[in-house]
């Protein structure tokens, strides 16, 4: 079956439509610091408003413990949605209680309401199917149809993603359709050379995608904290850098597999080593075989790829026709260790082909470092969902929509 899209729902004029968006944005002092996910939800919302639907948006934010927690309120998001849509957005003080019921019942054709954080309710993320179904039924009472547009959560079997889609006539929104189109281009006959750049802190988070991609790519570039496990697998000493010793054997297996497949795994030549973790820490650039040659010995820790590596990676990225990047090259939140991430991001903007930022921390990094969405071929809104798709996994939030 093909993914059901908005057209499959017929006319939605005057209909109540519950829309699952992913509005899980970072907040600081009650202010949104990166509104990328809010902006990504706008095309679907505009389409529903134009049809004259009565739109009730649901989303999570953060990881509250199944109960109301003011620091995770969606109230700031309602304000930003209103600004982007150019119309008032009613904010409900709860998700399925009297506040939500009043907000939805008061909607006129083309109006929009945002209900409070889904995860203030234990049924949203419950491991018990019956509890999820009961919560989904409460949400379904607010709609005549359901539109799933939160790509960042389609790999989760949660009430508003899976059970709600079964409880109402349902379809995917424009964002999910766009995300899948891009991911299909990465998996179905990608233009070559095809280069994948992986970073982030842990090898263990990327094992599945490394194993699945090795037979499919031309080269794999490794940065971020995970690089030190690769270096250790080659016999290098890495000081106090992040190291998953229990994954060294697995990494050795991947290095051997890549050799047999003729796929090049490109590892850093140099790294930025710091005396400690901190923005004002002393730091030096060292070749990967001299990480402990700093005066700090085994207490030094690598926090970014070095300038030579950044140039090598950038050249590889610019030479490719298809590039997928997931995971920062270093601790980009600290200015002395952001150069590697900034360099590869810049190179990705210069790709003559498809350059994809794979969501999560990578998307946060490009925004924090001053890049705009339109500089890249695509910035995914789902880090975990993108990786699981590229691992070849079936995603419950998509299967329930006919995918």
Swiss-Prot record:
InterPro entries: Phosphoglycerate_kinase (IPR001576), Phosphoglycerate_kinase_CS (IPR015911), Phosphoglycerate_kinase_N (IPR015824), Phosphoglycerate_kinase_sf (IPR036043). It comes from the Bacteria. This is Phosphoglycerate kinase. PANTHER family: PHOSPHOGLYCERATE KINASE, PHOSPHOGLYCERATE KINASE 1, CHLOROPLASTIC-RELATED. The keyword Ion transport does not apply. It comes from Leifsonia xyli subsp. xyli (strain CTCB07). Pathway: Carbohydrate degradation; glycolysis; pyruvate from D-glyceraldehyde 3-phosphate: step 2/5. PROSITE patterns: PGLYCERATE_KINASE. Belongs to the phosphoglycerate kinase family. Keywords: ATP-binding, Cytoplasm, Glycolysis, Kinase, Nucleotide-binding, Transferase. Substrate binds at residues 22-24, 37, 60-63, 119, 156. GO terms for cellular component: cytosol.
């Amino acid at each position: 079956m093909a993914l059901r899209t908005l057209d499959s729902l017929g006319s939605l004029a005057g209909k109540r439509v519950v829309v699952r968006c992913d509005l899980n944005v970072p907040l600081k002092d009650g202010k949104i610091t990166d509104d990328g996910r809010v902006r990504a939800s706008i095309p679907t919302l505009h389409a529903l408003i134009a049809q004259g639907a009565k739109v009730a948006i649901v989303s999570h934010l953060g990881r509250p413990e199944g109960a109301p927690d003011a620091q995770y309120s969606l109230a700031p998001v309602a304000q930003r949605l209103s600004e982007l849509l150019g119309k008032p957005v009613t904010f409900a003080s709860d998700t399925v209680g009297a506040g939500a019921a009043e907000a939805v019942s008061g909607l006129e054709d083309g109006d929009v309401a945002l209900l409070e954080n889904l995860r203030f309710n234990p049924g949203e993320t419950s491991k018990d199917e019956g509890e999820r179904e009961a919560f989904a039924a409460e949400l379904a009472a607010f709609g005549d149809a359901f539109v799933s547009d939160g790509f960042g959560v389609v790999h989760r079997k949660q009430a508003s993603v899976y059970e709600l889609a079964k409880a109402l006539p349902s379809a995917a929104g424009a964002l999910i359709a766009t995300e899948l189109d891009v991911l299909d281009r990465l998996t179905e006959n990608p233009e070559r050379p095809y280069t994948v750049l992986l970073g982030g802190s842990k090898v263990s988070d990327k094992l599945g995608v490394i194993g699945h991609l090795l037979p499919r790519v031309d080269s794999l570039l490794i940065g971020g904290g995970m690089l030190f496990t690769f270096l250790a697998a080659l016999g290098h000493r890495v000081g106090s850098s992040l190291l998953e010793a229990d994954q060294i054997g697995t990494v050795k297996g991947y290095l051997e597999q890549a050799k047999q497949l003729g796929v090049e795994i490109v590892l850093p030549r140099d790294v930025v080593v710091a005396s400690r973790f901190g923005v004002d820490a002393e730091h030096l650039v060292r070749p990967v075989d001299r990480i402990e040659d700093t005066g700090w010995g085994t207490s030094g820790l690598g926090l970014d790829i070095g300038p030579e590596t950044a140039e090598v990676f950038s050249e590889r990225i610019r030479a490719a026709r298809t590039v997928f990047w997931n995971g920062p090259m270093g601790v980009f939140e600290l200015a002395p260790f952001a150069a590697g991430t900034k360099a590869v991001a810049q190179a990705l903007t210069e790709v003559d082909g498809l350059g994809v930022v794979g969501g999560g921390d990578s998307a946060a990094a490009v925004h924090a470092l001053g890049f705009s969405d339109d500089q890249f071929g695509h910035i995914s809104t789902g880090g975990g969902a993108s990786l699981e798709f590229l691992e070849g996994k079936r995603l419950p939030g998509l299967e329930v929509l006919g995918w």
